[in-house]
Structure formats: structure tokens, C-alpha cells
Amino acid sequence: MTIRRLPPVLIDRIAAGEVVERPAAAVKELVENAIDAGATEIEVLVVGGGREMIRISDNGSGMSADELSLAVERHATSKLPTEDLLAISTLGFRGEALPSIGAVARLSIASRPKSAPHAFEIRVEGGVVTPPRPAALNGGTRVEVRDLFFATPARLKFLKSDRAEAAAAADVVRRLALARPDVAFTLMTDDRQPLTWVARSMDEAGRAARVADVLGAEAGRNLIPVVGERGGVRLVGLAGLPTYSKANSLSQFLFVNGRPVRDKLLMGALRAAYSDLLPSDRYPVLALFLSLDPREVDVNVHPAKTEVRFRDGGNVRALLVRTLTDALAARVPSTAGTIADRLVELARTPELEPARPAAAIPEFRPYRAEPMPAGGYDWRASPARPLNVAEPDGALEAEMESFAEAVQASFDVGMPAADARADAAVPETGDLDRPLGAARAQLHETYIVAQTREGMVLVDQHAAHERLVYEKLKAALERDGVARQGLLVPAVVDLDPAEADRLAERAGDLAALGLVIEPFGIGAVLVREVPALLAKADVTKLVRDVAEHSAEWDDALPLERRLLHVAATMACHGSVRAGRRLRVEEMNALLREMEETPNAGECNHGRPTFITLSLKDVEKLFARR
């Protein structure tokens, strides 16, 4: 078979396979052209998922008749004034989009510069160009794409449903709208309600407002500002609370010099920054903007221009990880507002239960027939009214009696305190002004109820203490290692032979965390020392859990990350368990320590440690609002 030159139309169709693989790609290229033309208002219409029609209208600089003819030729562009590809400041630069779209669709472009007496329109159908002719247009440019891929029908078989393609196109517009808050956008898809985003300023306040416009008010309430700079690279933006996360990465918006990207290096940095805060299957919501010298980043590495290559990728990664880590650690303890909203919603829309026989439903009488005793009811147990609880053992009896008396004292409103322990049950009024308030009660020996000036806080005692222990282990690692405590009698832990071998290989890593082990025959290890923070933990269960999680370690994972994985497992064993009764002083001490600890709003697995309900939320529960 001899070599031959391909005809221009076929060349354009081949190129279109890289540049325009789906309707969303065409929308991206056309909106980027509008932004590069200086438009401040852009309108996007998508019909039939983009297969039937895509129309982009803008108020940019416009093109003359001669420029229209050049615009539909391959590699003709106004965006490269020189031959330097390392100083690109525009979104587009190759001059491939319009001829590629025209090769596989019916394309029409009407444009009018501000100084021109009227507009001109050019048409391209399947690669065949019709010369420009006069047209009616007030100003700017209008690009209309109909019957996308009619010239390459095989491509249509690979498209998804109209709804899915329209959603992909909308995502493209959202990303570009976030990149340029100073541009007003209107998005229309079929019969859906148009989305309009007004122009904002390009400063941090304008970016935050545009993020709230595009992602919704709920996202705006659950994002915190981040600002950082390192080695000539500046980072600004908004990062989501760990408790406000998604099941996919579609809500992660990254921009480099105003260009939306989905770069592997940047995505890896995000995972590292949130590794202690989110489980592996959850993704933070964020919008981050990197600015650097165009010569320090190569944007010409992917046909769709969605990937970039940094000259100093390590510097960029370090900036992202450090800035996000510091911002998340420095925040006042808080949880996603959506948690309280969902709680209110669930409380006000109870699930339907299967109907029960009428005889099984006791009659509810809100008022008693007999009068209330003058001294009020005695809430304490008596032989006539025994409490339906298990008898405490001797070790806990004194503590439980003290707790019961403290609770009884809190019920005796207006009565003098019986002793000093009753006074301890009522926290200082000043605690109400603290972020997590003053402890008032414990529910099911698992949850702490605290009161604040503005409402109430519900704390998961195990999750909260797990985070506190984990942060202490991390701090000890960063200093001079975790303090150890020797066992009076070394513990022998039986394991699967493979697990025992893995732990033996990691003995050095574990020693840095205070867990000193050594091989003890086949399928067993001998534990000589444990971290001092975990002195009361079940050694056998601790070692078995560490062995189980060690199977998930990747040898390529840095030592620091492996140690933190072990620390997270240890923290779970060293924390207050659900089912343990706490005194009021212990509950308040836990709250105060949470206020001083970084990332106290979520446990090591990404679950919230507490939720806050404002008085307004509580009033909603009782339909008072």
C-alpha cells in the first residue's frame, strides 16, 4: 500500500476526534474563545444534549469578514502574537477548534466588531466552507453548531443520553464561570430553567460570591478561605469542610492561571491534604486558583488543554498541601451546616411505619388525673420504683452514684445544693460563650449534650476523643517520638503467619510509634512496650488491628504516611469508648480540649465528631418557625 496525502476535510475530521470528542468539548472550546475575545456577557444554549444545537453568544470584540475566513482555517489564531509557546496567557492558542467543529457539524458564525457598520456570517458544513455574507447582529459574536457529528455518524454511537451530555456541558460552563467571576453567564439547556450568574469582581470576595452562585448557598456556608504563596506560586480559593464531602470528585474545581484543569499532581496533593480528615471514598468540595508565571507551566501537553506540566511540581504540591492543611487545622471547630439541616428535615418528615393493631397502641393522656405532689416528683430510684438497669459492679458503683446525685441536683430547680458535687454538675456560665459550650447531659453513655448561647451541641464522645488521641500521636511523632510504657509481662499475640511476618518487617516503623514488638515463633509476636497514651488499651486487639491494616500499606507510600495510618488505628483503641459513663467535669474537659485541637470537627475516618443546632434549628423541630 502506497503512502498518500490525506485530503484537508479528512484531516480536519481526524483532528476533531481529539478536540471535539463530545458536545461538552465543543461548548468548552467556544466559550473559551468568547472569553479570549474579551466578552463580559456570555449566553450558552444547549439543545438535545448538544447533538441538535449548541449556540454561544457573547459581547466580545467580534471579527471582520476577512478574520471570519481565517478563523475556520486550521492553525489560524490571533492568540499567539509570537512563536513563544512558553508564555501563553489565553485559554485557546492552537486554532483547531472552529475548523474541527466545522468538519463534523453544521457550523455558522456571525460576528460584528464594534466599529463595523454591520455583521458578517460564515458557514461550514462537514468541512465545506461558504464565503462570508452580510448578517444581522448588534455586536459581538454568535456561534451556532447544529447536527453535531452528522459527518461522522459512528461518533454518535459513543455519546450518552441527552441528559448526561447536557449535564457534562453544564459542568464545563460552571468551571469556566468559576474561573472568570468578572464575566456574566447565562446557561440554558432544553426546557430547564435558565441559570444566570451575574458578573462579580476578580478579588477574593468576588470569587467567594461566584462560588456560592454556582455551587449553591449550602456550599458557600461550608467552605473556608485559603491563601498561600511559595516560590513564586500563589494560591487562593475556598476549601470545603471535611464533613461536607461528596462521593465523587466532580465538585473539585482547580484552576491554573484561570484555566480549568484536572491535573494528576494537583489531585494527588488534595488527597494528601485531606488524608487525615476524609475516608478514601469521599472527596472534598473546593475551588482553588493557582497563579504563577506562564513560563513556569506548560499548557500544551493535552489536546483538550485540561492537563498541565509544572516546571517545579514539587513546589506546587508542597504549597497546596501546606496551605490546605494549615487552613483546615486553624479553623474554629465546626461542622457542615448541612448536617443540622438534614436533622431538622428528618425530624419533621418521620418515616411511615407499618400499621399496628389498635389494641397494641396505648392511649396517650398528656394530663394525669391525680394532682401533682406539693414537693414535686422524686426522680430517684426507690424500692417501689426500681430503675430498669443492670446492677453496677463495685468498681463503678461510687462513680455512678456521684453522677446520679449530680443529675438529681440539676432537676431540683430552686432548691439549695446538697453538696459540692451537685455544684459541679452545673457548669460555669462562662462556658456557654465557648464554641462548644457547657456540658449538660450524656445520652446512652455515648453522646454529650452541651449548651451554648446560641443553641446546643451534640458530641460523639468516641469519635471526638479518637481525634484528640490521634493528634497527640502525630505531635509526638513530629517532636522526638511517642513515649513508651513497658509491659510488666510481655504479651504474646497469635496472628496469621503472613500478618506476623508483615509486622516483623515493620517493627522499626512501629517502634517510632511506641509499639515495640519482636517475632515469637511462627504466627506470633511478642509485645514488650506500648505507647503511653494507650497504656490501658487491649494489647491483643490493638496488635491484631494494626496487623490487619498493615496489609493495605503500599510499599511506595512514604514512611510518614504509613506511620500516620498506624497512628490512626492506635487512636481508635486509645479513645473513650461508646458506653462509658462520663462525669460532667470529664465531658467539659473533653469539650475544652476539642476547642484547642486541630481538625476536631471530624474523627480520623472523616465522620463528624459533633453537630451544632442553633436555637432557630430547635424551634424548627417544634414548628415554632
Curated annotation (Swiss-Prot):
Name under which the protein is recorded: DNA mismatch repair protein MutL
Top-level taxon of origin: Bacteria
UniProt function note: This protein is involved in the repair of mismatches in DNA. It is required for dam-dependent methyl-directed DNA mismatch repair. May act as a 'molecular matchmaker', a protein that promotes the formation of a stable complex between two or more DNA-binding proteins in an ATP-dependent manner without itself being part of a final effector complex.
Keywords, sorted A to Z: DNA damage, DNA repair
SUPFAM superfamilies, alphabetized: ATPase domain of HSP90 chaperone/DNA topoisomerase II/histidine kinase, DNA mismatch repair protein MutL, Ribosomal protein S5 domain 2-like
InterPro entries: DNA_mismatch_repair_CS, DNA_mismatch_repair_MutL, DNA_mismatch_S5_2-like, HATPase_C_sf, MutL/Mlh/PMS, MutL/Mlh/Pms-like, MutL_C, MutL_C_dimsub
Gene3D superfamilies per UniProt: 3.30.230.10, Histidine kinase-like ATPase, C-terminal domain, MutL, C-terminal domain, dimerisation subdomain, MutL, C-terminal domain, regulatory subdomain
Database matches in PROSITE patterns: DNA_MISMATCH_REPAIR_1
Gene Ontology biological process terms, A to Z: mismatch repair
SMART domains per the UniProt record, alphabetical: DNA_mis_repair (SM01340), MutL_C (SM00853)
Source species of the chain: Azorhizobium caulinodans (strain ATCC 43989 / DSM 5975 / JCM 20966 / LMG 6465 / NBRC 14845 / NCIMB 13405 / ORS 571)
Molecular functions (GO terms): ATP binding; ATP hydrolysis activity; ATP-dependent DNA damage sensor activity; mismatched DNA binding
Gene: mutL
Family (UniProt): Belongs to the DNA mismatch repair MutL/HexB family.
Pfam families cross-referenced by the UniProt entry: DNA_mis_repair, HATPase_c_3, MutL_C
